[in-house]
UniProtKB/Swiss-Prot annotation:
Organism of origin: Chloranthus spicatus (Chulantree)
Compartments (UniProt record): Plastid, Chloroplast thylakoid membrane
Swiss-Prot/TrEMBL keywords: Chloroplast, Membrane, NAD, NADP, Plastid, Plastoquinone, Quinone, Thylakoid, Translocase, Transmembrane, Transmembrane helix, Transport
Domain of life: Eukaryota
Transmembrane segments: 9-29, 64-84, 88-108
Catalytic activity annotation: a plastoquinone + NADH + (n+1) H(+)(in) = a plastoquinol + NAD(+) + n H(+)(out); a plastoquinone + NADPH + (n+1) H(+)(in) = a plastoquinol + NADP(+) + n H(+)(out)
Name of the protein in question: NAD(P)H-quinone oxidoreductase subunit 3, chloroplastic
GO CC terms of this entry: chloroplast thylakoid membrane; NADH dehydrogenase complex
Role this protein plays: NDH shuttles electrons from NAD(P)H:plastoquinone, via FMN and iron-sulfur (Fe-S) centers, to quinones in the photosynthetic chain and possibly in a chloroplast respiratory chain. The immediate electron acceptor for the enzyme in this species is believed to be plastoquinone. Couples the redox reaction to proton translocation, and thus conserves the redox energy in a proton gradient.
Amino acid sequence: MFLLHEYDIFWAFLIISSVIPILVFLISGVLAPINEGPEKLSSYESGIEPMGNAWLQFRIRYYMFALVFVVFDVETVFLYPWAMSFDVLGVSVFIEALIFVLIPIVGSVYAWRKGALEWS
């Protein structure tokens, strides 16, 4: 028979972890001073008056390299637990991990062939 009281601790943690951030945002909104002025609209540069415009455009190439880095970084995070328990898992999990690694590699080769990773 399925008993709901087995999940009481889970629900308590879920409720507490949801209520605390909401309370923090509400309290900070109530206690924060509301001062609008030109100082709030300027960028802060270690106490020095800002020089030039704070809005800069970056080339799309930076975003492409950052995106490729994030994809492989997330892949590494997912593969680490698999590698730590490799001796316990079977061959089918190895094949699944191989497919998991091949999908971003195929995507990177495609982006490389299309010239998305060229720096020129």
